[in-house]
Amino acid sequence: MKISITAPAKINLSLDALYKREDGYHEVEMVMTTIDLADRLSLERLDEDKIVLDVKAHFIPEDRRNLIYQAALLLKKRFNVKMGVRIIIDKHIPVSAGLAGGSSDAAAALKGLNIIWELGLSIEELAEISSEIGSDIAFCVYGGTALATGRGEKITALPNIPGCWIVLAKPSISVSTPTIYKELQVENVEHPNTKKMIESIKIGDLDGIFASTGNVLESVTLEKNPQVKRIKDRMMAFGAEAALMSGSGPTVFALIKQYSRAKRVYNGLRGFCEEVYMVRPWSESENETIN
């Protein structure tokens, strides 16, 4: 059996860290949505008991360091699976960008393996299992738009956001998520209005969504990396209705209602930034094919 499945990127419409927990993680409130920038995974069931990864990108490990490998190994051990799998990963999501590319790949792998290994697990069971690998993976298992709480693994579904344009720009730098959280001072930052964001999404109010965007991690990343702030400022100068860093960065995204204005923002970032994308909110159409 072979299956092909997409792994869409995510953006944080709002990201709040409330306090640091005893386990070392921060208690978070994040409103996230998937977008139509996506990796593609092709999975083939093997009779031989082995996990084979083939990543069509440089600098990405194909062994136990890869979240996809960890996801496959976890399912094999949990359910005593004696079959193997070959997974080909066609990368389109920028790496180390704050867009959950690795987490989305792992989520797609869990869903694909559930099918080709005939495990019969529910989406809720897959999400629960995923929390053993990483905090963002549970959201990626569900996809769409949702509120993530706890350390990010508790998911409450929300309606999809209204149609709009999203321009992404990633500078040629990398940031360390653990370092950003370590330097975050939750008592000294402006916190986003998560409640207002959720209310705006529920009634389909794009202006309310734009006005409610916020990310407490900007207080650290923008201070350490001025080029990230310059991208955000440039997006607003070219007509973005909202601009925000996704996750711990360094990718910044702009939200725009009209295509013509989005194109202007996109063109204004090309040449200024190495990786620029113009996308839409994710649609579930053509998510997976089975042969």
Swiss-Prot record:
Question: Which Gene3D superfamilies does this UniProt record tie to the protein?
Answer: 3.30.230.10, GHMP kinase, C-terminal domain
Under InterPro entries, the record lists: GHMP_kinase_C_dom, GHMP_kinase_C_sf, GHMP_kinase_N_dom, IspE, Ribosomal_Su5_D2-typ_SF, Ribsml_uS5_D2-typ_fold_subgr
Q: Which GO terms describe its biological process?
A: isopentenyl diphosphate biosynthetic process, methylerythritol 4-phosphate pathway; terpenoid biosynthetic process
Q: What is its EC number?
A: 2.7.1.148
Functional pathway: Isoprenoid biosynthesis; isopentenyl diphosphate biosynthesis via DXP pathway; isopentenyl diphosphate from 1-deoxy-D-xylulose 5-phosphate: step 3/6
Record keyword Lipid biosynthesis present: no
Per its record, the protein catalyses: 4-CDP-2-C-methyl-D-erythritol + ATP = 4-CDP-2-C-methyl-D-erythritol 2-phosphate + ADP + H(+)
UniProt GO molecular function? 4-(cytidine 5'-diphospho)-2-C-methyl-D-erythritol kinase activity; ATP binding
What transmembrane ranges does the database entry give? Answer: none
Could you name the domain of life of the organism this protein comes from? Answer: Bacteria
- Transferase as a keyword? yes
- Keywords per UniProt: ATP-binding, Isoprene biosynthesis, Kinase, Nucleotide-binding, Transferase
Which residues does the entry assign to the active site, renumbered to this chain?
10, 136
**Binding positions for ATP per the UniProt entry:** 94-104
Pfam families in the record, alphabetically?
GHMP_kinases_C, GHMP_kinases_N
Q: So what family is this one in?
A: Belongs to the GHMP kinase family. IspE subfamily.
Q: What does this protein do?
A: Catalyzes the phosphorylation of the position 2 hydroxy group of 4-diphosphocytidyl-2C-methyl-D-erythritol.
- Fetch the NCBIfam families from UniProt: ispE, PRK14608.1
Q: What is this protein called?
A: 4-diphosphocytidyl-2-C-methyl-D-erythritol kinase
